[in-house]
C-alpha cells in the first residue's frame, strides 16, 4: 500500500506522462491556485524529469478573484492586458503543453454581479480567441485535473471537520483517477483508454442521424448529428501527433450536435457549479437548436447570464455519453466540480462545439460553422444522465437502435 506521498507522486506522474505526454524540449505551462503550490511543484519536477524545456507558472487565488469582482473599477472587466494575451497565445503557438489544476470554492463568487462575470468572460474570449481555437483543434496538448482545497472539501462533505473532509475528498479523487495504492495507475489508464476507443469505433460504425433522450425527470430531447460527425473519447492527438488526455478523470465518449438540430426539453440531473455559483434543478426548452426558455429553482439569474454570453451560448456544442454505473457515479458523491460530475453522468454542453467531424481539426472556424457546428466563447457542461435515462439512436436508413437503456450503454454498444 502506497503512502500519501507516494500517491501524490504517482498522480503527478500520471498527469505529466499520460495526461500531457510531455516531450523532451517542450515547454509546460501550469495554471494553479496558490493553495495547490505543493502539487504544482511535484508536477513541475516530473516534467523536468521527462526532459521539459521550461515550466512556466500561472498562479490564481480565489480570494483575490472575488475581491476584484467586488471592488475593481468597472471598466476593468471589458479589457484583457496585452501581456496576458501574449502569455496564452504565444505559448500555444509554440506548441507548449498546458496543465490546469482545477480547485476552487464552488460558491466563491456567490453574490457577485453576474454582469461583471459575463463581461470579463466576453473580454477574455475576444482576447484569447487564437488560444481557444488552437485548443479545440489540437494545436497543443492540454490536461485538466484537480486536487482538494478546504473550502471545496467542506462543500462536498459539510458534516465533517475540515481535516476529515479533506481526507475524504482525497480518497474520492484518487479512486476517480484510478490510483489505488498498487502503483499501477498508468497501466490502468492505458487499458481504460483502449476500452473507450472500442466504444468510439462502434458508435462511428453506426453513424447515427439523431439521438433521442428520455427520462422520468421530463427530458424528451432529440439531437440531430451533423453529416460526417465522429465520436471521440479521452485520448486526443495534436496536429503534430502528440497524444494526450484532456480531462483526468474521463469516462465519456462524445461528439458535437448539429447546431440547429436540437429540439425538445432537457432537465438537469445534478447541480452545476458555474462561475462560483451553484445552479440546481433547472431545465431548458430548445427549438431549432436554440435555448428559448430557461428555468432553475436555484441560480436562475446565473444560468440566464451563462446562456447569453454571446449568440452561440444559447446553442449546444457537445453531447457526451457516460454510463450511470461509472467509477465516479458509484461513489455517490456530488463533487460540485464539473470535471468529476460530468464523468458521473451523461452530459450536454451549451456553447462552443468541438471539431468532431471527419477532417475537423484541419477546418477553419468558418468551415466548421458551414458544416453545422456551433461557435461561441463559452463551453459549459451540465449533467442529464439518470438511472432511467434511455437514448435511442436513429440511423440514416430509419432504424432505431438502443444506445442507453436505464442509464447504461445498451448491449452491443
Question: What are the residue ranges of the model-derived segments?
Answer:
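Extended hydrophobic packing segments that form well-structured cores
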Residues: 367-413
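A short secondary-structure junction signal
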Residues: 110-113, 153-158, 235-236, 277-280, ...
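Short solvent-exposed loop/turn micro-motifs enriched in small/polar/acidic residues
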Residues: 13, 204-206, 275-278, 312, ...
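Long, well-ordered mid-to-C-terminal structural blocks that present hydrophobic/aromatic surfaces
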Residues: 255-311
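Active-site lining segments that contact anionic ligands and/or coordinate catalytic metals
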Residues: 261-263, 279-281, 288-291, 314-318, ...
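Dual-mode signal for accessory low-complexity, basic/Gly-rich regions
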Residues: 293-362
Amino acid at each position: 500500500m502506497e503512502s500519501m506521498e507516494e500517491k501524490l507522486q504517482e498522480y503527478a506522474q500520471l498527469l505529466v506522462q499520460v495526461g500531457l505526454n510531455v516531450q523532451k524540449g517542450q515547454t509546460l505551462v501550469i495554471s494553479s491556485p496558490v493553495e495547490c503550490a505543493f502539487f504544482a511543484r511535484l508536477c513541475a519536477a516530473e516534467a523536468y524529469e521527462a526532459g521539459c524545456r521550461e515550466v512556466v507558472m500561472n498562479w490564481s487565488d480565489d480570494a483575490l478573484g472575488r475581491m476584484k469582482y467586488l471592488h475593481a473599477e468597472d471598466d476593468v472587466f471589458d479589457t484583457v492586458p496585452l501581456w496576458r494575451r501574449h502569455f496564452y497565445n504565444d505559448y500555444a503557438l509554440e506548441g507548449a503543453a498546458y496543465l490546469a489544476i482545477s480547485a476552487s470554492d464552488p460558491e466563491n463568487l456567490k453574490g457577485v454581479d453576474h454582469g461583471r462575470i459575463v463581461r470579463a468572460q466576453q473580454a477574455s474570449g475576444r482576447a484569447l480567441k487564437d488560444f481557444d481555437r488552437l485548443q479545440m483543434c489540437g494545436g497543443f496538448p492540454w490536461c485538466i485535473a484537480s486536487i482538494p482545497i478546504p473550502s471545496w472539501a467542506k462543500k462536498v462533505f459539510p458534516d465533517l471537520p475540515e481535516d476529515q473532509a479533506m481526507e475524504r475528498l482525497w480518497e474520492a479523487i484518487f479512486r476517480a483517477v484510478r490510483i489505488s495504492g498498487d502503483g499501477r495507475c498508468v497501466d490502468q489508464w492505458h487499458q481504460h483508454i483502449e476500452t473507450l476507443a472500442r466504444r468510439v469505433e462502434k458508435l462511428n460504425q453506426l453513424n447515427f442521424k439523431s439521438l433521442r433522450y428520455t427520462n422520468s425527470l421530463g427530458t424528451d430531447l432529440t439531437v440531430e448529428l451533423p453529416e460526417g460527425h465522429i465520436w471521440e473519447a479521452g485520448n486526443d492527438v495534436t496536429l503534430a501527433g502528440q497524444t494526450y488526455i484532456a480531462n483526468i478523470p474521463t469516462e465519456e465518449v462524445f461528439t458535437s450536435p448539429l447546431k440547429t438540430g436540437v429540439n425538445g426539453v432537457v432537465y438537469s440531473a445534478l447541480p452545476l457549479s458555474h462561475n462560483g455559483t451553484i445552479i440546481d434543478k433547472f431545465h431548458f426548452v430548445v427549438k431549432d437548436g436554440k435555448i428559448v426558455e430557461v428555468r432553475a429553482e436555484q441560480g436562475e439569474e446565473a444560468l440566464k447570464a451563462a446562456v447569453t454570453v454571446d449568440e452561440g451560448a444559447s446553442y449546444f456544442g457537445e453531447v457526451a455519453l457516460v454510463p450511470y454505473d461509472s467509477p465516479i457515479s458509484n461513489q455517490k458523491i456530488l463533487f460540485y466540480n464539473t470535471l468529476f460530475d460530468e464523468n458521473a453522468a451523461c452530459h450536454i454542453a451549451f456553447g462552443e462545439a468541438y471539431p468532431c467531424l471527419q477532417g475537423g481539426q484541419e477546418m477553419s472556424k468558418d468551415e466548421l460553422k458551414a458544416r453545422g457546428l456551433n461557435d461561441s466563447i463559452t463551453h459549459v457542461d451540465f449533467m442529464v444522465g439518470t438511472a432511467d435515462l434511455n437514448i435511442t439512436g436513429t440511423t440514416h436508413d430509419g432504424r432505431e437502435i438502443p444506445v442507453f437503456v436505464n442509464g447504461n450503454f445498451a448491449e452491443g454498444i
